[in-house]
Each structure stands twice: as C-alpha cells, then as structure tokens.
C-alpha cells in the first residue's frame, strides 16, 4: 500500500524480498522446519541487499532514477535495515550486556537483535552504511540493543521513527520512544 502510494506520486520505488527473513522463513519457523526467526547473517545481508539493489538500479536506470538521493523505509526488521544503511553500527557492547538477560526479557525483538552475537565476523559501519541514503523512515524498528544509544547518536541523516502502541514484537517504549531520544540529528521525528 505504501509503495503504491509513493509510486502514484512519482517516486521510483523498489520493494525487495529478503529470502532469509521473508514470509516463507516465518512460515518454516511456525511449521517447525526452522529453529530461528531468521538466520543471524540476515543482520548483515539485508543492508547489503539494499546496497546491491541500488547498484543494479544505477547500472540499469541511471537516466530515470537518481540513486544518489535515496530515502529508505523499513518496518520492524526493515527498520533496523534502514537505520544500518543510515550509519548506525552494531553495538557489540550493548548486545553483550543485554543478551544474557534474553530469557527474562519481555522484549521479543531481542530474539532477533541477539542473533548478532552469532555472526562469526566483526562488521564495521562502512560495510553496511550507504552514502546514497539521504533520509530514513523506520516503522516499529528493533534498535534498543543492537544499536543502542551510542550507535543511534551517530546518525546524521533525517530520521522518522514511527511507533505503534500494540506491536508485541517491537514494543514502543524500549524500541522506538526511548531510542528516539538517542538520535542527535537535527531532523528527527517521532510518530
């Protein structure tokens, strides 16, 4: 619905399907065919998927699409992806502090965030960030531990966080409202 609306107003829109965190992956989890919500590598692959997509668009549609002035919108895990592309980096200290408490936490998004500790390599911001991204809208993002205050405060782009009051996976207070206060960019909005 959002992609159609933006396209109807003249925006070029791309809606990627991330195989490791798609509806098919969730269905496999619910049917007992997978043991994780998503493979840990998806925390790295999703931002890289977007960078790859922008590269392909630049190669094939450079006369029609300005890929040097891109806005990214993502929901839940996609919100994480959008913020990683904007320059938020995985905060290993925050994850090491929070994830041992996973079994007693009521924050279901930590199930995904704490998967980062299973990634076998250390990833730096430059690998996930994309300078072509100029603004971000993150809807119900999961950010509290994987980015934390230190990382979110480094984003310099305009950011809009959209929060819902009834999201059982990414609860509003710890995942959007408090993290909104960590943003230091001049252009920040909480909806």
Language-model-detected regions and their locations in the chain:
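Gly/Ala-rich beta-loop-alpha elbow adjacent to hydrolase catalytic centers
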Residues: 74-78, 82
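Short beta-strand immediately N-terminal to the catalytic nucleophile in serine-hydrolase-like folds
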Residues: 72-74, 162
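Residue in the alpha/beta-hydrolase core beta-strand immediately N-terminal to the catalytic nucleophile
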Residues: 69-71, 135-137
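Conserved alpha/beta-hydrolase "acid-adjacent" motif
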Residues: 147, 168-175
């Amino acid at each position: 619905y959002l992609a159609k609306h933006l396209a109807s107003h003249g925006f070029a829109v791309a809606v990627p399907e991330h195989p490791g965190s798609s509806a098919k992956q969730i269905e496999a989890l619910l049917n007992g065919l997978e043991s994780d919500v998503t493979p840990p590598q998806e925390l790295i692959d999703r931002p890289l998927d977007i960078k790859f997509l922008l590269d392909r668009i630049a190669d094939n549609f450079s006369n029609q699409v300005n890929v040097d002035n891109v806005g990214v919108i993502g929901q839940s895990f996609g919100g994480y992806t959008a913020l990683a592309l904007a320059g938020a980096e995985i905060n290993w200290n925050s994850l090491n502090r929070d994830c041992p408490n996973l079994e007693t936490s009521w924050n279901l998004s930590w199930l995904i965030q704490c998967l980062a500790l299973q990634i076998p390599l250390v990833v730096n911001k430059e690998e996930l960030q994309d300078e072509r991204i100029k603004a971000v809208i993150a809807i119900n993002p999961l950010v509290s531990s994987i980015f934390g205050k230190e990382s979110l405060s480094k984003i310099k782009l305009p950011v809009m966080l959209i929060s819902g009051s009834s999201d059982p996976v990414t609860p509003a207070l710890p995942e959007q409202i408090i993290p909104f206060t960590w943003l230091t960019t001049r252009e920040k909005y909480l909806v």
